[in-house]
């Protein structure tokens, strides 16, 4: 088992995949979760998050069209992250920037990954599409159908038990 781990940690393909996942987390996942958690804390209606979900898709398209805003050593979190805030793990980002020249397929894999993520994002958020039911709903209708910004209350066995008890 140790040899497998050693081999994986010294495999260019594995390193490339891990670097792509980590930089995606820094650019999209962490900022998204921070925003959704903030919306939950503010008791914001999930049905009002359509514009934010469109922003996520647009941000992924921006990186697809110009991945250098994310992977050059002079890249700024101001344009590279979804929220324009500092990196969650700046040391990880710097390490990835150092590794990029040694990973010959990094940029292509990054763009391919972001394209797949954007396609999936569009499919998962289709109910927020302009002209759709949620987009066309009035504020009163959205209030009547209010939903929390996260599904945390229903996650896991404890969440299911809690829901059952109420």
Report each predicted region and the residues it spans.
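Detector for Asparagine
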Residues: 4, 45, 65-66, 85, ...
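Amphipathic alpha-helical/coiled-coil segments positioned at domain termini
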Residues: 1, 101-166
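Generic preference for well-ordered alpha-helical elements
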Residues: 18-21, 25, 29, 49, ...
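Low-complexity, serine/threonine/proline-enriched polar segments
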Residues: 65-125, 129
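Generic detector of leucine side chains in alpha-helical contexts
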Residues: 5, 9, 18-21, 47-49, ...
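A eukaryotic "domain-edge + linker/cap" signature
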Residues: 1-76
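Generic recognition of well-structured, leucine-rich alpha-helical segments
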Residues: 28-31, 35, 59, 63-67, ...
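A sequence-composition feature that detects small, non-aromatic residues
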Residues: 8, 19-27, 35-39, 80, ...
